[in-house]
């Protein structure tokens, strides 16, 4: 589930690795290897340092920020994780994936009203994208943000009537599994998706 936050933040956002400094990509990749299985704080702190180096080399490198958020969450530093998330805003003001992640991070930090505003904005942006050029990732995350916004588990069948033939069976099953988990333990699932232990 940890990798889902990367999907939420980065899928459908072209951060074009070719345009990112190779040294920044290398530092980010080193941070991922260093973090390993998120088992010890020394490795996580080293991974945060490497993420900071990647960000210093390439301030718009969203994946480095997303990884740093995961490492901070694994250390239980959710306020710092929120501040890191908010640093990405200038690079992603209209990116529904970023706004969804921001909403979850705000909710994790007990800022429910701001989180709800973010969920509403993300839902609107996903709707626009689904009307223009629908993708599996957009629909999957649209269903997810609807649940977070309305605290209601919508039927995939109903949503797929409006947006038919987008989800493959495997992605549909994954989406349904996440939604089933959410309906029982919303806070736990959000915490886990953000990289918290």
Residue ranges and their predicted role:
Residues 53-54, 87-88, 122, 129, ...:
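Canonical positions in the second alpha-helix
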Residues 148-197:
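Terminal, low-structured helical/coil segments at or just beyond the last alpha-helical repeat
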Residues 59, 92-93, 127, 167:
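Short coil turns that delineate tetratricopeptide repeat
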Residues 41, 75, 109, 149-151:
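Structural motif corresponding to the intra-repeat A-B loop/turn of tetratricopeptide repeats
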């Amino acid at each position: 589930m940890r990798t889902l936050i990367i999907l939420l933040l980065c899928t459908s956002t072209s951060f074009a690795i070719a345009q990112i400094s190779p040294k920044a990509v290398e530092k980010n990749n080193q941070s991922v290897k260093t973090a390993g299985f998120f088992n010890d704080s020394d490795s996580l702190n080293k991974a945060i340092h490497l993420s900071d180096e990647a960000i210093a080399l390439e301030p718009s490198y969203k994946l480095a920020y997303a990884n740093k958020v995961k490492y901070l969450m694994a250390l239980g530093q959710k306020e710092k994780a929120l501040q890191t998330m908010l640093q990405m805003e200038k690079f992603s003001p209209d990116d529904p994936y970023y706004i969804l992640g921001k909403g979850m991070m705000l909710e994790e930090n007990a800022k429910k009203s701001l989180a709800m505003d973010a969920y509403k904005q993300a839902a609107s942006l996903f709707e626009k994208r689904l009307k223009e050029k629908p993708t599996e990732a957009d629909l999957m995350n649209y269903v997810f943000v609807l649940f977070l916004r309305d605290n209601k588990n919508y039927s995939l069948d109903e949503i797929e009537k409006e947006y038919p033939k987008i989800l493959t069976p495997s992605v549909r099953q994954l989406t349904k599994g996440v939604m089933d988990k959410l309906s029982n333990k919303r806070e736990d699932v959000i915490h886990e998706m953000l990289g918290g232990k």
